A protein has these predicted regions:
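General small-molecule cofactor/ligand-binding pocket signal
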Residues: 30, 110-112, 181-183
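Conserved beta-strand signature within the Rossmann-like core of class I S-adenosyl-L-methionine
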Residues: 153-160
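Short "lid" loop at the C-terminus of a central beta-strand within the Rossmann-like core
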Residues: 132-134, 161-166
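Conserved SAM/SAH cofactor-binding pocket of Class I
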Residues: 43-128
């Protein structure tokens, strides 16, 4: 069965547009089978977009596990002078995110596979609704890889469902060298702020 974290989804394509009204304007996303959030904007993603603090106005920003691009597009709108890196292993997700950014005229979004970001890039902010279902070990490796690329004054905001391990992820991140606090909750989700 095809999973949203597969490189090449085997699910039959059936694009569907979703529309979400935000304080800074309407967000129109084309979604598809085999990509996280088919036919909707996930509740955790919504919470992160609505509750995360202001982003740096410039620099390099990362949407880790971009899916169709809800986070990346929101970041690009809020920080038009920044470069937003939208990263996903899933080819279909990258194609949708790039297309959605283009439809919104957001030219500061660079959609890439994980290994295509230059090594010297350091992130001033990371937003992620991480792929929890890849498994605990793989998730920890993923987070350590990318949080380790934060700029000295950078920070990450992660949204995780409580019943999928948010409350155990927080102390693990702190013990792994990334002091983490919970800054918001809602609809069974936690927003974690890591440094």
């Amino acid at each position: 069965m095809s999973q949203y974290f597969d490189e090449e989804p085997s699910a039959t394509s059936d694009p569907l547009e979703v529309v979400w009204s935000l304080p800074d304007g309407e967000l129109r996303l084309v979604t598809d089978h085999g990509v996280f959030g088919y036919g909707r904007v996930d509740q955790g993603t919504k919470l992160l977009i609505l509750k995360a603090p202001l982003l740096p106005p410039t620099g390099d920003l990362l949407d880790l596990g971009c899916g169709t691009g809800a986070l990346a597009l929101s970041m690009a709108r809020r920080s038009p002078a920044a470069t937003v890196w939208a990263v996903d292993v899933n080819r279909r997700a990258r194609e949708l995110c790039a297309s959605n950014a283009e439809r919104h005229g957001l030219h500061n979004v660079s959609v890439v596979a994980p290994d295509d970001i230059p090594d010297e890039v350091r992130f001033d902010a990371i937003w992620s609704n991480p792929p929890i279902r890849i498994g605990k070990t793989a998730l920890h490796e993923l987070l350590l890889r990318w949080l380790g690329r934060m700029a000295d004054d950078g920070s990450a905001h992660l949204v995780v469902q409580k019943h999928l391990g948010a409350d155990s992820l927080q102390p693990w991140l702190t013990a792994s060298g990334h002091p983490t606090e919970r800054i918001a909750t809602g609809a069974g989700f936690r927003i974690l702020h890591a440094r």
